[in-house]
Amino acid sequence: MAHAAQVGLQDATSPIMEELITFHDHALMIIFLICFLVLYALFLTLTTKLTSTNISDAQEMETIWTILPAIILVLIALPSLRILYMTDEINDPSFTIKSIGHQWYWTYEYTDYGGLIFNSYMLPPLFLEPGDLRLLDVDNRVVLPVEAPVRMMITSQDVLHSWAVPTLGLKTDAIPGRLNQTTFTATRPGVYYGQCSEICGANHSFMPIVLELIPLKIFEMGPVFAL
Amino acid sequence: VPEPVSESLKLLGFLDVENTPCARHSILYGSLGSVVAGFGHFLFTSRIRRSCDVGVGGFILVTLGCWFHCRYNYAKQRIQERIAREEIKKKILYEGTHLDPERKHNGSSSN
C-alpha cells in the first residue's frame, strides 16, 4: 500500500506494473530534459539585453523545433504502445473471478470450482482492530494465488465504479450492463490495497478493494472455500 | 503501516534521482559532458553566451545518450535475471525426473 504523502508509484507486484514503472521513468527523464531546456530559454529571455524585435525568417530554427518534438513524441509513443498491447495479450488464465460493484461495496464470485459468492464491505472505524488500516481494510478479502494468471470480470449492478489495485497496475471500469475483463499475474505474496476509482455517490471513498495473494500450494488446499 | 521513506533528492521537484535506476548515472555524466563541452567551446571561441548554449545542449545530449545506453543494459540484465530465476526454479523442480533438461541433454549426447 502507499505510505502517507506518497506521490510516486507503488512497488510492482506484476510484470505489467514493472513495465509501467520503467515507462514512467523513461517519460519522466524526457520531461525533465524538456523542462530544463525551457527553463534555460526562459532565463535567457529574462536576462537578455537585446532589443531587436526582428522575429521573421528563422527557417532553420522552425524546422528544428517542428521535427524535434515529433521525434520526442515517437520516443515516448513506441514504449507506450508496446505496453498497451502487452496488457491485451491472451495469457491463458487459470482462474476467473467476477467482481461486481454496488453502492457501496464489492461482490466477488468464485464460480470456477464451486459457487462461492461474498460481499466485501469496508470495515467501519468502530470495528477496526489495532493494526488495521482505516478506510482500507475490509471484512472479506479477495484471496488469490500467486504466479497464476487470473482473469477478473468486472461489472456493476447500479452506477459506474472502477476496480483498481495500483500495485498490480490494474484499473478497470465497472459499468452496468457491460462485462469488462482484465488479467494479471501476481509475482509475490502479500496483502494489496486499492480503492474505487470512479465517482459513485456519497460513499465512493469507502468501498476499498483488498487482495490477499497466497502461494499456489496453499490456495489449492482450499482456504478460500472453507468459509 | 509502512513508514514514509526518507526524502530523496528530486531534480526540479519530480525526478527522483536516487530511486530511479540509471538516473543518477545519466545526470552525472550529463553534467560532466556539459562542463566539458561548454568550457571547451569557450576556450576555443571566448564566446560566453554561445558556450553556455553549447553547455546546455551538451548536457541534454549526453544525459539522453547515457540514459538510453544504461536503460538498454538494465533491461537486458533484468531479462537475464528472469531467465536465470526461471531456469533455477525448473532445475529444482525437475531434477531427477524424466523432465530434467540436463538428463535429456546428457542422454542425447551419449547416444
Curated annotation (Swiss-Prot), chain A:
Mark the transmembrane ranges.
15-45, 60-87
Sorted alphabetically, the Gene Ontology BP terms of this entry are: ATP synthesis coupled electron transport
Chain ranges sitting on the Mitochondrial intermembrane side read: 1-14, 88-227
| Membrane topology (UniProt) | Multi-pass membrane protein
Asked if the keyword Transport belongs to this entry, the reply reads yes
Q: How is the cofactor bound?
A: Binds a dinuclear copper A center per subunit.
| Keywords associated with the record | Copper, Electron transport, Magnesium, Membrane, Metal-binding, Mitochondrion, Mitochondrion inner membrane, Respiratory chain, Translocase, Transmembrane, Transmembrane helix, Transport
**Gene Ontology cellular component annotations, sorted alphabetically:** mitochondrial inner membrane; respiratory chain complex IV
* Subcellular location, principal: mitochondrion
Superkingdom of the organism of origin: Eukaryota
Q: What is its EC number?
A: 7.1.1.9
What does it catalyze?
A: 4 Fe(II)-[cytochrome c] + O2 + 8 H(+)(in) = 4 Fe(III)-[cytochrome c] + 2 H2O + 4 H(+)(out)
InterPro entries from the UniProt entry = CcO_II (IPR045187), CcO_II-like_C (IPR002429), CcO_II_C (IPR034210), Copper_CuA (IPR001505), Cupredoxin (IPR008972), Cyt_c_oxidase_su2 (IPR014222), Cyt_c_oxidase_su2_TM_dom (IPR011759), Cyt_c_oxidase_su2_TM_sf (IPR036257)
Query: Which family is this protein grouped under?
Result: Belongs to the cytochrome c oxidase subunit 2 family.
What is the protein name given in its UniProt record? Cytochrome c oxidase subunit 2
- Organism of provenance: Gorilla gorilla gorilla
Q: Which gene encodes it?
A: MT-CO2
